[in-house]
Every structure is written in structure tokens, then in C-alpha cells.
Amino acid sequence: MYPYLKKGNRLPTVTAAQILLNRALRRGETIAVDGDFGRKTREAVINFQQNHHLNDDGIIGKNTWAALVRGQGLQVIDTVDVAEVADIGYEDQDIRDAGGNPIVNHGMSGGLRVVLDQILARGQLGRVVLLRFHGHGSPGNMGLSTGTRSDVPSSEFTADYFRIDRFRNFLARLAPLFCPFGSVEFHGCRVGGGQAGKKFVEGFAKVLKVPATAGKQTQYGGGRSTFRFEGAIRTAFPGGKTLKAWSASQAEAGQMSVYR
């Protein structure tokens, strides 16, 4: 439902937050849009929080994010793999408690198509600021409706799928859902690790035309952990851009694109 962001984060979602902050700030008070949550971004967050009578801790959490996106017409879509009994009522419940309505996926064959169809049904054109996948993972692999099993056919994302034209073409149907400064995140364990993880995020960035981020280490769920990454991450950008270059390219579009 929201990304948990604080000083030190370097993410496409920070870029989105900076754009939204600039929309709310007075002329002359705007901050650089670079994806780097540094001192000036924290100061801008505190200023925004004080102006909106929020807890001025300099952290973007549930309430601050809700205030930033109010009236913007933007969507955060979460999809959660609950194929394991232990996963039910965990991250999916965290998202509900934060006011979200996650797409919940139980163990099934062919889950990949089912999940993507649900995203297409829920997403609105040009309005998704964050698409986030929760579940089990491994380097270059993200479970969608598999739990920890590896023998459920077509129920996961894997780097090898980008060799298949049919998969790329089907996945590309999601691209029009994203707003100009949208992104996709994979919160499975070590999905971004190694060469397989590099191929994985690069494949998504190329096909979806938005940044793709995955954790390189073990990821946790529960409470705030459901809404943030643990440890090192890997992000790929469309056209091979850097975070700074991609962020700069979105700054002007972000000022112009207000969704009602």
C-alpha cells in the first residue's frame, strides 16, 4: 500500500516521493529529483509532515505516503504468494491493515497468467506508481503462487523466461499501466543476487519500460519489513540508465502529470 522510505535509501520509489513532494512544496522550495533520500529530501519530508499535521519524523511511512498521493490518482498494487500455510495472514494482512487490497495467490499450476490477468484487471492506465511482488525467491526467480516448491509449472517469474517471445509479449501488456515515474519491486529472498538476478531485473526493466528492483539478500515480512527492502538491492533501468539519469528524465514529466 505504501513504500517505507527513509534517509539513506536510493530507489525509484524515492524518485516518486521527491516528485510528489515537489508538487506540494512552494515555488523555490523544491528539491532535486535524483532518487537519493539525503538530507534535503528528509528536510522536505519534515516540512511536508508539519504542514499536514503529521508526525514529523522525516520518514515516509503509511500516513505520509497517503498524504503525498492524495488527489493524485496513483495506484500501488501488491501481489502476495500465500501458497504456504504459514504465509497466510502475514504480509497480505499487513497490507490490508495499511489500507490496501492485495492480490493474494494460492498454490496453483499456471499461476503466472492468473496473477498477470489480475494485475491487468485492477491496474488503471498510466496510474500505477508501484507494482510490488511478495513471496519466496532465489537468484533470478520470484515465486507467484508456488510457496517454496519448484515443481509447480508456470507459477513463477524466472530470468530464463525472457528468452521466450510469448512471455515477453504477455508481460508487456502491463507496461501501459505505469505512470511516468512508476517502478516494479520483487521482495523475495535474494531475487536480485548473482548474474541470474542481474538478468532478471534487466529483463523486467526492458519489457515494462520502468525500473525494476530486487533484494540481493534475505528479505523479511511482517510490520514495516513488508514495505521495505533489507540490505543490498539491485535495480535495472530502461535503456541502461543510472538512478540519477532516470530520475532527472522523470522530473519534468512528474511536474506535468497530475491524475484526477
At which residue positions do the language-model features occur?
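Acidic, Ser/Thr/Pro/Gly-enriched interdomain connector segments
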Residues: 1-35
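Intrinsically disordered, low-complexity Ser/Thr-rich linker and spacer segments
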Residues: 2, 67-77
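Structural recognition of the beta-strand scaffold that forms the well-ordered cores
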Residues: 20, 59, 75-84, 129-134, ...
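Extended, structured, electrostatic nucleic-acid-contact surfaces
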Residues: 21-32, 43-56
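A domain-level signal for caspase-like cysteine endopeptidase catalytic cores
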Residues: 73-123
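Catalytic cores of nucleophile-dependent amide-cleaving enzymes
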Residues: 133-134, 139-223
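Caspase-like cysteine protease fold
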Residues: 214-260
